[in-house]
Amino acid sequence: MVNLFPVFTLIVIITILITTRELSTTMLIVSLVTDYIIINTQYTEQQHENNTFSMPQKNSFNESYNKDKKSNTHIPYQWLAPELKEAESKYWWGNYDPHSEPVLAGAS
C-alpha cells in the first residue's frame, strides 16, 4: 500500500505557497520541508544499515572459482602486429581521408 502522507503534505504546502504572498511564511514552509526530507533520508539510511548483515556471507563456490581462475591480462599480442600494420594501411582506421572517397551519382 502506498503511503499517502508525503503526497498530502506536498499538496498542502503547494496550496499554502499559492495562497500566501509573504516571504516569511514561504521560507518557513521551505525550511520545514527540507528538514522533513533530511530527517526522512537519514532515517532510511540508518534503517538500511541496520538491515544489512554485519558478517558477509561466505560462498565456497565463488572462493574456489576465484582461486582457480587464471589471470588472462598478460596475453602476448606480438603475433598480431603484422596484421594490424596491414589493416592500418588498408582500412579506415589507418589513413582515412573522407575527401578521397568517390562521390556517388545522385547523392545530395
UniProtKB/Swiss-Prot annotation:
Identify the keywords attached in UniProt to this record, alphabetized: Glycoprotein, Late protein, Membrane, Transmembrane, Transmembrane helix, Virion
GO cellular component, as recorded: membrane; virion membrane
What organism does the UniProt record list as the source?
African swine fever virus (strain Badajoz 1971 Vero-adapted) (Ba71V)
Q: How does it sit in the membrane?
A: Single-pass membrane protein
Q: Which cysteines are joined by disulfide bonds?
A: none
Ranges of Polar residues compositional bias?
49-64
Q: Which regions form coiled coils? A: none
Q: What induces it?
A: Expressed in the late phase of the viral replicative cycle.
Q: What is this protein called in UniProt?
A: Inner membrane protein H108R
